[in-house]
Amino acid sequence: MKTPLLKPLLITSLPVFASVFTAASIVWQLGEPKLAMPFVLGIIAGGLVDLDNRLTGRLKNIIATVALFTLSSLTAQSTLGTGLPFILAMTLMTFGFTILGAVGLKYRTFAFGALAVATYTTLTYTPETYWLTNPFMILCGTVLYSTAIIIFQIILPHRPVQESVANAYDALGGYLEAKADFFDPDEAAWIGNRHIDLAMSNTGVITAFNQCRSALFYRLRGKHRHPRTAKMLRYYFAAQDIHERISSAHVDYQEMSEKFKNTDIIFRIHRLLEMQGQACRNTAQALRASKDYVYSKRLGRAIEGCRQSLRLLSDSNDNPDIRHLRRLLDNLGSVDQQFRQLQHNGLQAENDRMGDTRIAALETGSLKNTWQAIRPQLNLESGVFRHAVRLSLVVAAACTIVEALNLNLGYWILLTALFVCQPNYTATKSRVRQRIAGTVLGVIVGSLVPYFTPSVETKLWIVIASTTLFFMTRTYKYSFSTFFITIQALTSLSLAGLDVYAAMPVRIIDTIIGASLAWAAVSYLWPDWKYLTLERTAALAVCSNGAYLEKITERLKSGETGDDVEYRATRRRAHEHTAALSSTLSDMSSEPAKFADSLQPGFTLLKTGYALTGYISALGAYRSEMHEECSPDFTAQFHLAAEHTAHIFQHLPETEPDDFQTALDTLRGELDTLRTHSSGTQSHILLQQLQLIARQLEPYYRAYRQIPHRQPQNAA
């Protein structure tokens, strides 16, 4: 069935709205408004751990969620008020659940939800309430939300996957538009800055692709493959192919802009890339509307105009760089062909082979592999372990403060610290500001609620609206979500018969204390800046690019042209590790005083590394053409030089300067020999591409050696 033309945020919030509305109706019918708080908190907990999956996968997730929530809620409830046993129980649960996140996204999500439920249990405690009431109501809320999400999945089974694929095309559209800036001849002198901008944009593409891959992975695990899921898989593969071709670099952009700045070809390519970016956005819009993408005839005329301009340019100019422009246009033509195929659903036959439609596993996948995933993380070099220890100490401190001072409603401190303390210093600092701002504003607005909503019914409507708005805003604006959840919390306290005005200053003070604990923890307990290992991230990036080049060389040698799961996984790792380098530098840039000596070589590494990934991707686009014109002598020598280049990249982090120079001299000799065997157009193109790749070796190695306190290590 067709998905209604509703905003994605509204669609994803419908299960929450339905759940809270049902809970409020039940509470109103029973005449027990004090049950609203634990009931709604259970719904919120269920929403926090909700992960898209096929129907049977969701049912398994619900069972695991209820089991974990039962354990954490009963543990918190049974030890609450006992002093040291409660502090120990909460601390151990925090460490255990957080370190479990090392297994994968699913376990990390469930573990955080279990910690949230334990905290919710402490928040809803009152001495006069039977001890099982609040844990039971929290679990009822979780089950109610789970039931609602199952119903909505039956009604709109493919909406989450469509939204994930649409987000991937939106991100890809932004990436294409960023790539278009490379073809602005008036900005040729500042192309180095464009590389950094493009790398940052690429991080968003990789994130969107990974979310899309995750959604498809869980939908494809069953034996039956729904036609709509298969269609989304084809769209995903098309996006991957477009990304590889657009991220490829066939020429030195600065040199090309200088040489062709007075011709119209540069401006035409710039316009074509912008139009292809818009085509990606149009694809995203079509997916969200459950319609087929309609290919724009203007796009076809634009690519034909580029080709005509190139023909006229080549007729009047014997510049050898013309052939590189021709290869660039051939690549853009392949992107255009992908859009044409999307309209006609022409990828069906190409991608329905089983070997082409597998997706690499996302995580270890089962509990039996849990220890194998956790064991390597049990050291301070692991960000997961540092976060687990840090968060455990924060929880212990918060619980100790509340228990020692016997603070009324004091567990808001624990809740704030738990949600604000992130593995990353920059993210935590941002959340501290947003949490405090959202809470203060929420308290101000919440103080007006009793004047305008004296009845139980209107207060329940406030709870419904604020909870729904919390979920609508939590993924993109944390201060807004904090604002809405503060209003919800104060209204729930009012429904429970507590003095809201007495709770308001407590809420603000507790938020400040909890946020301060989180900030102090990430600032002084194994702070991130001591472990922001630019060296390791750069090593992983260059090694994964070497593996990517090696995989392409194998394909060129064997003549294979398909993108099987192994090739896609290798390509994805190269892009992910390059994106990780971008993220690391972004974090370091927020603390320039601490990383002053590392930032300059870091940005050189990013610019060079991103160019390297682009040149390797371009070589990957030639996989089907190696044997068309190349002589056997050229082919053999090309494989030798390419394999040697890949080997140098893969072992670059551990190579000493003298050994690196020897290897580089040997490679240059191999490339000189290869040049003597280069005769046809195709061999010239392949030679030039390999030379562009090899050209990145020296600047990358030089920048890598300039990283302060560098120690030899093997990142491979």
Q: Where does each model-flagged region fall?
A:
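Elongated alpha-helical scaffolds
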Residues: M90-T94, F237-R245, L612
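Alpha-helical transmembrane segments and their membrane-interface boundaries
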Residues: M1-L115, Y120-A148, F152-L156, N319-F484, ...
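Long, hydrophobic alpha-helical segments that serve as membrane-spanning/inserting helices
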Residues: M1-L14, S25, Q29, D50-L51, ...
